[in-house]
């Protein structure tokens, strides 16, 4: 007995496959055939789309031209509507994409006429551009605020040793203290210093020059850990202590935390000769609810 099926051959090895597009690799062969000659085992016909395409993006309805969806070849949308992949339709015949459609209109506006979203939508539209693999849109969004500024900020943070690890430590310490004390908030001490070299409490050039003449044994006395929960520094960049504090507040707030901080003094530990550690100490207050 010979059993003949209508299963489509693997089109990934056919001459018509998009070998250069990563977007198309995300799709599987059609779960439901678009056109078959049942019982004869013949290849499936490509799915055909109308010139004007009705869309259902996660429940949000849009209508656009097929040429708009295919404007850039190496994108997920161009691959989806190339005819090589089966796109399901809803009860009204709209082609369905299981994705939040809140910002899909901004994506369509770029494909239609090159329009860019307002600044407050840039981050969200950038996420959609990544999903649909729209390179030209990604490139332009990354040259807009706030993404352009974020690139500069990350370049600075890249010079900061263990920044992410220390940030996580702040959150974990604050959480543990709040739980242990059954408190709404927790406080912790954070040292932020740009320069490794401690300074004297006196503005005296003679005393300051001593730091360049210290012995190796004296050098060990300069290496100490301030009595704080977390320390940030040193770093080599124009950005100063206040810039790093701003980064800390920004990243902690992005996790949904309420953050307050204030300088409560300096370490002031005596090191050697006339030298005292003058690294600033900040008190961070993390409020959980």
Curated annotation (Swiss-Prot):
Q: Which Pfam families match?
A: BTB_2
List keywords of the entry alphabetically.
Cell membrane, Cytoplasm, Membrane
Disordered, as annotated region: 1-42
The reply on keyword Glycoprotein is no
Primary location: membrane
User: What species was this sequence derived from?
Assistant: Mus musculus (Mouse)
Outline the extent of the BTB domain. Answer: 53-141
For this entry, the protein name equals: BTB/POZ domain-containing protein KCTD7
Which tissues is it found in, per the record?
High expression in brain, particularly in post-mitotic neurons. Expressed in the mitral cells of the olfactory bulbs, the hippocampus, the deep layers of the cerebral cortex and Purkinje cells of the cerebellum. Not detected in astrocytes or microglial cells. Also expressed in heart, liver, spleen and kidney.
Q: Please list which residues make up the signal peptide.
A: none
Q: Does the keyword Cytoplasm apply?
A: yes
Out of the domains of life, which is the source?
Answer: Eukaryota
| Coiled coil (UniProt feature) | none
Q: Name one GO biological process term.
A: positive regulation of transporter activity
Gene Ontology cellular-component terms for this entry are:
cytosol; plasma membrane
What does the record give as the function of this protein?
Answer: May be involved in the control of excitability of cortical neurons.
């Amino acid at each position: 007995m010979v059993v003949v099926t209508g299963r489509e051959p693997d089109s990934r090895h056919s001459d018509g496959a998009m070998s250069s597009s990563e977007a198309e690799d995300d799709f599987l062969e059609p779960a439901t055939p678009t056109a078959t000659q049942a019982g004869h085992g013949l290849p499936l016909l490509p799915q055909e789309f109308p010139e004007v395409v009705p869309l259902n993006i996660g429940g949000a309805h849009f209508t656009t031209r097929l040429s708009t969806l295919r404007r850039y070849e190496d994108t997920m949308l161009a691959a989806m509507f190339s005819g090589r992949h089966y796109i399901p339709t809803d009860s009204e015949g709209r082609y369905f994409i299981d994705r939040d459609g809140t910002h899909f209109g901004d994506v369509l506006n770029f494909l239609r006429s090159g329009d860019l979203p307002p600044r407050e939508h840039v981050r969200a539209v950038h996420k959609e551009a990544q999903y649909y693999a729209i390179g030209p849109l990604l490139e332009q969004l990354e040259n807009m605020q706030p993404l352009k500024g974020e690139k500069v900020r990350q370049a600075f943070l890249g010079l900061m040793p263990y920044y992410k690890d220390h940030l996580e430590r702040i959150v974990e310490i604050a959480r543990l203290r709040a739980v242990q004390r059954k408190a709404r908030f927790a406080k912790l001490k954070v040292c932020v210093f740009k320069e490794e070299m401690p300074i004297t409490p006196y503005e005296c050039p003679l005393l300051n020059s001593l730091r360049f003449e210290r012995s190796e044994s004296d050098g060990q006395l300069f290496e100490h850990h301030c009595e704080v929960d977390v320390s940030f520094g040193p770093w080599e960049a124009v950005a100063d202590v206040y810039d790093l504090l701003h980064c800390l507040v920004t990243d902690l707030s992005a996790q949904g935390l309420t953050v307050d901080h204030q300088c409560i003094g300096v370490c002031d530990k005596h090191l050697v000769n006339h030298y005292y550690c003058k690294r600033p100490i900040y008190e961070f207050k993390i409020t959980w609810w």
